[in-house]
Regions:
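Compact soluble domain cores
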Residues: 1-57
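Short, compact, well-ordered microdomains
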Residues: 51-84
Length: 84
């Protein structure tokens, strides 16, 4: 299976303006793919672990900006929580 990673326009805009944010996104994707679901409840983490192809993870950047990573089988989307 080939995973396709996408980002919303707002995420792409912030990445384009801020290389530090780009590094944060890359690190967050690495964490997501390794099963580190970030800042979510234990219940949600257990659901992700039981079915990682349909997972939602959440991470907070050093500047306080929060992102979500939503996986639906072979499509992974990086977005801001307000975009869900």
């Amino acid at each position: 299976m080939q995973i396709r990673v996408t980002a919303t326009a707002a995420i792409a805009k912030k990445v384009h303006k801020n290389t530090g944010f780009q590094r944060f996104i890359n690190n967050s994707l690495d964490r997501h793919f390794s099963g580190d679901w970030g800042d979510i409840s234990e219940e949600d983490a257990a659901a992700n672990t039981s079915d990682p192809l349909y997972a939602l993870s959440a991470y907070t950047a050093p500047d306080g900006v929060k992102i979500w990573i939503k996986q639906d089988y072979d499509v992974v989307t990086v977005l801001f929580p307000s975009e869900y």
